[in-house]
Amino acid sequence: MFQDNPLLAQLKQQLHSQTPRAEGVVKATEKGFGFLEVDAKKSYFIPPPQMKKVMHGDRIIAVIHSEKERESAEPEELVEPFLTRFVGKVQGKNDRLAIVPDHPLLKDAIPCRAARGLNHEFKEGDWAVAEMRRHPLKGDRSFYAELTQYITFGDDHFVPWWVTLARHNLEKEAPDGVATEMLDEGLVREDLTALDFVTIDSASTEDMDDALFAKALPDDKLQLIVAIADPTAWIAEGSKLDKAAKIRAFTNYLPGFNIPMLPRELSDDLCSLRANEVRPVLACRMTLSADGTIEDNIEFFAATIESKAKLVYDQVSDWLENTGDWQPESEAIAEQVRLLAQICQRRGEWRHNHALVFKDRPDYRFILGEKGEVLDIVAEPRRIANRIVEEAMIAANICAARVLRDKLGFGIYNVHMGFDPANADALAALLKTHGLHVDAEEVLTLDGFCKLRRELDAQPTGFLDSRIRRFQSFAEISTEPGPHFGLGLEAYATWTSPIRKYGDMINHRLLKAVIKGETATRPQDEITVQMAERRRLNRMAERDVGDWLYARFLKDKAGTGTRFAAEIVDISRGGMRVRLVDNGAIAFIPAPFLHAVRDELVCSQENGTVQIKGETVYKVTDVIDVTIAEVRMETRGIIARPVA
């Protein structure tokens, strides 16, 4: 009799509309209960039985119950699931399979089966890609997943690489395809094969993008020719190879190996500027005045060159610093190295005075055995030879940015707008508390930004610099010319790595149109979105593989008294993140390791400090000694403890 009662339906509707609800993200804990985080300040308790309906990271709407002053959340509706496609480890075998997602806060095995047409008999320990098919908040009885791809077996030494690439849905190998002959582009190529061009790279580099030639001119001027590998001489726009490169957008550099954007035959051979091999190039000729200014007579042209020597960073640096036993093979090569060092010096000074120079941070290199084991991790400081190449490339990219802006009005530009205008007042207020006075309007201009950066660089520590990083906007890829505040430049467009960056290939085609006096089509904005997304995924992949290898490397140090110098990089409510100075590993120090009495401890992300009994004991950028307390291989987490 109550079945179709309109009054009852109305009452139900009223009760439903009056019941308090909240939307937020589920945060799981290791204790079985969880929280519904509505915003930074408000969260609701989710009891263990209710947590069985949801997963860490799910965005849900929940009913809020109040009992005895305590509020709790009952999940009601799924807004956005945390897991859709994921990687994990298979449990069980054949007809009774489950998969445990590879995520630090997802511990429960999800029942699953292999998708139709997937011809692999899954067994315990296998790694797989899965997709969620059922969710309790969608009216299903339980969670259920489908295995869509076999990655590798559990004991494969190369699990970190294969699992990471599958997680981010990235290619595992070089693209297929060959380029048999050069295109007829209607370009006249200048013959520069007689000039003493040199390449400077790591000893193991095969994909040499750039060769340099320097010459002294009257009036204390210097000429620099930057010659860049020319893959667009082989790859036609819109061709199969071009489309593959467009999707990949970049060569993916992972510890131990790379997955190239172009077929290796092109990247490591036909286009690579190998010593004593004639190669087509796109080149830029520029004149530098005595103070390092790039004069206005910039010239882009097509050419053929023959590199006369493959030089190695460390050997060149040693020779310039009068150490080591390496010698240039001829006086002509020695003269090139001396002139290039002079150019580097001038350009470095010019950028220091008129733009911005990054602080040198070492690169960390993993030395791996044949089975992917980490033999060592070495810090490679950026030395004079690295800076020679860097200054030449930055100068060449400044030239391209100017020419594309003035001749076409578009290109693929790296744009960085400095501080987000919405943060300008907060930034000025923060700086004021540290004794630096800036105008909130001025700091949004390129000159104002550069002025502030120079003041920050002159500070005794990097603490204040670390505090203002959160106010900065992100660098973007744009088809529109715009400033790059981070470099302190009015415009910056890269073209010096076309073997490994698709955006540089686009700029090559645009520069060739300028050389030939032809009209060019503006690149579509979608390509910049694809490039930004690929760059993000590649960086995440590099970080994930690195985390795995760091965990492997430091595992046997856990529980020993081995000390490591570590820089504090971040402070949060739960503790501190530190970077080990010698090898670059990131470790976490939980708050209880800092001080036993929680009420006397304040970890402030806002201030970048840790206070104990009101005294600042640690701050971001401090370098402290730590030992490794624990390495959790299943989450690749490294837990450290400060040395008392």
Swiss-Prot record:
Keywords noted in UniProt: Cytoplasm, Exonuclease, Hydrolase, Nuclease, RNA-binding
GO terms for cellular component: cytosol
Reactions mediated catalytically: Exonucleolytic cleavage in the 3'- to 5'-direction to yield nucleoside 5'-phosphates
Chief localization: cytoplasm
Keyword Hydrolase: yes
InterPro entries: CSD, NA-bd_OB-fold, RNase_B_OB_dom, RNase_II, RNase_II/R, RNase_II/R_CS, RNase_II/RNase_R, RNR_Ribonuclease
One MF annotation (Gene Ontology) recorded for this entry: exoribonuclease II activity
Top-rank taxon: Bacteria
Biological-process GO terms, alphabetical: mRNA catabolic process
Entry coiled-coil feature ranges: none
Enzyme Commission number(s) from the entry: 3.1.13.1
Location in or out of the cell: Cytoplasm
UniProt domain RNB: residue ranges: 189-516
Chain ranges of the S1 motif domain: 561-643
HAMAP family on file: RNase_II
Entry function: Involved in mRNA degradation. Hydrolyzes single-stranded polyribonucleotides processively in the 3' to 5' direction.
Recorded family membership: Belongs to the RNR ribonuclease family. RNase II subfamily.
Record's protein name: Exoribonuclease 2
Gene transcribed to yield this protein: rnb
